[in-house]
């Protein structure tokens, strides 16, 4: 639930800034073309800025320690495994990092296939067998090779644009309706209009989050398939089985969680960035 809240809050922050800037610049929201252009600038702008700084943000947020020179055999094996899988997948070697967390998790991030980061938690590194870890690493390398970071950024940009545009169009319709039934023809007034826009931003933002989560789940299945090709189906299934036996992951922020191996669980599957582990295992066994 915390992941969902953070995702919605981030989108709402972008939308709120867009509203303030539009008001300051006097953008006429009744002009559909101008509104759509402005919505696209903010919708895609925020998404691509997040993508551009994603690797830097991940290192700072998670306290990732990039392995430049392996200190022991475990770190050496980790780097060599990622290097081998990256070569198999046809991508540039990602940076490899470790972050301190008891959770068994890992994630991939970065603005492109040739500028990426694969990070694993200490809980995963020392709590799984090498075969299981190899499956996890293959999953993350597949995310990079599939271009999932860019794909979901584009999807996020589209839905952000939709939210900004649709909320203000609907608010304009409501304002016109109130104005036509008001003797003075003043409409909602600035503060009431902003309140209506905020509520609509929130409602459309929830819908947008569901759409992004749907596409994220599809990308998870694709990353599992890619991992099965890189490391073998048995290793990927073993990794998922191990994760299923463990506690829910709790320590990863939303932006990294979307590309992690183990997502947050939710009563409503449509709000989850990852399919249930049982479904992922079943899909691999059926493939």
UniProtKB/Swiss-Prot annotation:
It is an enzyme of class 3 (hydrolase). It is a multi-pass membrane protein. The keyword Phosphoprotein does not apply. It is found in: Cell inner membrane. Zn(2+) binds at residues 139, 143, 220. One of its GO terms (molecular function) is zinc ion binding. The active site is at residue 140. GO terms for cellular component: plasma membrane. Binds 1 zinc ion per subunit. Its EC number is 3.4.24.-. Keywords: Cell inner membrane, Cell membrane, Hydrolase, Membrane, Metal-binding, Metalloprotease, Protease, Transmembrane, Transmembrane helix, Zinc. GO terms for biological process: proteolysis. The chain crosses the membrane at residues 4-24, 33-53, 154-174, 195-215. It comes from the Bacteria. Its cofactor is Zn(2+). Belongs to the peptidase M48B family. This is Protease HtpX. It comes from Shewanella baltica (strain OS155 / ATCC BAA-1091). The gene is htpX.
């Amino acid at each position: 639930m915390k992941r969902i809240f953070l995702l919605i809050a981030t989108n709402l922050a972008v939308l709120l800034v867009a509203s303030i800037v539009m008001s300051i610049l006097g953008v006429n929201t009744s002009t559909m073309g101008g509104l759509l252009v402005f919505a696209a600038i903010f919708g895609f702008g925020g998404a691509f800025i997040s993508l551009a700084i994603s690797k830097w943000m991940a290192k700072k947020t998670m306290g990732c320690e990039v392995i430049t020179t392996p200190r022991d055999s475990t770190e050496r094996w980790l780097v060599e495994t990622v290097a081998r899988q990256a070569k198999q997948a046809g991508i540039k070697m990602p940076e490899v990092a470790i972050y301190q967390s008891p959770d068994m998790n890992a994630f991939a991030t970065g603005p492109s296939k040739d500028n990426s980061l694969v990070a694993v938690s200490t809980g995963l590194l020392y709590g799984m067998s090498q075969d299981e870890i190899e499956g996890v690493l293959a999953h993350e390398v597949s995310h990079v090779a599939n271009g999932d970071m860019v794909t979901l950024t584009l999807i996020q940009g589209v839905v952000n644009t939709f939210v900004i545009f649709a909320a203000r169009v609907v608010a304009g319709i409501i304002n016109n309706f109130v104005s036509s039934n008001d003797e003075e023809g003043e409409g909602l007034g600035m503060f009431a209009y902003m309140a209506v826009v905020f509520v609509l931003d929130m409602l459309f933002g929830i819908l947008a989050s569901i759409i992004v989560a749907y596409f994220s789940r599809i990308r998870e299945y694709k990353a599992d398939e890619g991992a099965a090709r890189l490391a073998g189906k048995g290793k990927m299934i073993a990794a998922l089985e191990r994760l299923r036996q463990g506690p829910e992951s709790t320590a990863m922020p939303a932006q990294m969680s979307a590309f992690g191996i183990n997502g947050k669980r939710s009563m409503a599957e449509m709000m989850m960035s990852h399919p249930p582990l049982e479904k992922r295992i079943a899909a691999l066994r059926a493939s």
